[in-house]
């Protein structure tokens, strides 16, 4: 019985360590490493379907799209109100993203003020609609910082896997679409 308890403790510790290695503590989303590892699995499945649809009758993932968001004028927000205000903006965007995507989709804080979504089964048009919904919702969302009520906007870019050979290609396409 003691052995089972020790095994359970080890499993829980492994789970905790994996979460801390793959999650961004501030936004509660995946970090870059965790997102990329998960996204590559789905992307490989979508590419396999595209290249060889005859190999199987059903595929888990037939489409995969990325959406990248960047908080507009984030440096100015930090410089004007302080880093805690910037942190609140990051938390607000992370929370709003999670409210607007499905449980199967992926979301990460890619770094700094940049966020990325992996939309499972989505084509470019689907991704655009989701990105536009998030962009509009953020534009109308206010967050409280101390006694101040602040707001911010985001810019985004989308791309689907159809023109990409790998994750890096797909990321570059979505990043380019942002500008």
Predicted segments, located by residue:
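Catalytic core regions of nucleotide second-messenger enzymes
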Residues: 58-61, 109, 138-154, 170
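Hydrophobic framework residues that shape the active-site pocket
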Residues: 74, 93, 107-110, 115, ...
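Short helix/loop segment flanking the catalytic signature motif in cyclic-nucleotide metabolism enzymes
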Residues: 89, 116-136, 169
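Short catalytic/binding micro-motifs of nucleotide second-messenger systems
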Residues: 49, 99-104, 136-147, 178
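Signal-transducing coiled-coil linker helices
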Residues: 1-26, 32-50, 57, 62, ...
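Heptad-repeat coiled-coil signal-transmission/dimerization helices
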Residues: 35, 39, 90, 94-97, ...
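Catalytic-core segments of nucleotide cyclases and related cyclic-nucleotide turnover enzymes
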Residues: 128, 132, 146, 160-179
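Conserved nucleotide-binding and Mg2+-coordinating catalytic segments in signaling enzymes
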Residues: 19-37, 69-82, 91
């Amino acid at each position: 019985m003691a052995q089972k308890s020790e095994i359970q403790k080890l499993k829980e510790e492994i789970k905790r360590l994996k979460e801390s290695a793959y999650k961004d503590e501030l936004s509660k989303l995946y970090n870059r490493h965790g997102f990329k590892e998960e996204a590559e699995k789905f992307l490989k499945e979508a590419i396999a379907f595209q290249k060889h649809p005859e190999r199987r009758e059903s595929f888990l993932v037939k489409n995969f799209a990325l959406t990248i968001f960047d908080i507009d004028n984030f440096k100015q927000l930090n410089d004007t109100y302080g880093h805690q205000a910037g942190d609140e903006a990051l938390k607000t965007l992370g929370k709003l993203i999670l409210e607007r995507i499905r449980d199967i989709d992926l979301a990460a804080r890619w770094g700094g003020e940049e966020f990325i979504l992996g939309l499972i089964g989505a084509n470019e048009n689907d991704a655009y609609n989701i990105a536009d919904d998030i962009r509009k919702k953020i534009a109308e969302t206010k967050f409280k910082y101390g006694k101040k009520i602040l707001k911010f906007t985001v810019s985004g870019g989308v791309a689907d896997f159809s023109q990409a050979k790998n994750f890096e290609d797909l990321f570059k396409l979505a990043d380019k679409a942002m500008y």
